[in-house]
Structures are given as C-alpha cells and as structure tokens.
Amino acid sequence: MRALTSLSVVLLALISTVSAQFGFFEQMFGGQQQGQQQRPQNVPSDSAAYRQQYDRSYCEHYLCPDTLACVHYPHHCPCPWPMNEDKFELSEGQRICVSKGGFAANEAARKVELARKGLL
C-alpha cells in the first residue's frame, strides 16, 4: 500500500511538471491560454476610420477637419492639442496651430511674426 501511495505521488509530480513545461512552451511561442486577454490591435494605416467619423459628423456651419469641432468660421477652429500648441489667426480668415515655444515666453508668436514678415 505504501509503495502504491509513493508511486501515485511520483506520478502526480511528473504530470504536473510536464503540464507546466507545455504551458511554458505554449506561452513562449505565442499560444493563447484560457483567461488571457488579447492585446488591442493597432489602428489601420489608412484614413478610412477618420473619413467615416467625418462623414457621420453633422455641422450647420463649418466642421473643422482636424478636430471635427463645429464652429461658425474656419479661423475659430480649436487646435487639436491646446496644451502643446498655440493658435494664431491669420489675416486670410484661417488659423494655424504652432507647437509652443521652448525656453522663452511667447517664442511661438515671435516666430510666426517673423515668418509673416518673411524673415524666417
């Protein structure tokens, strides 16, 4: 009886070791185990998803192409990243968004003004 118990313990240990090894190899070579979540997929490299969102957007006035904000005039469009960009309205009724300046205050505004004058 004692030999049978020892044999069953050894068999159980062997089976659990073999099972653990197969689980390791399955995980190493990309196998999916039950209960694991799949990683999210990258967005497609074409603009179809954006165009669908743009086509579904409703606006009575002007729909900003980069933020999909509905405004009265194109130069009222907000910048997509207001924490990182400064907005400048141009005399032609348009606006541009420029990355905020680095070290000096109002550096982006100074560079836009230099560009308007043709000095940059």
Swiss-Prot record:
Domain of life of the native organism: Eukaryota
Transmembrane segments: none
Keywords of this entry: Signal
Keyword Signal tagged: yes
Signal sequence interval, chain numbering: 1-20
CDD domains the record matches: LCL2-like
Family according to the record: Belongs to the LCL2 family.
Protein name: Long chronological lifespan protein 2
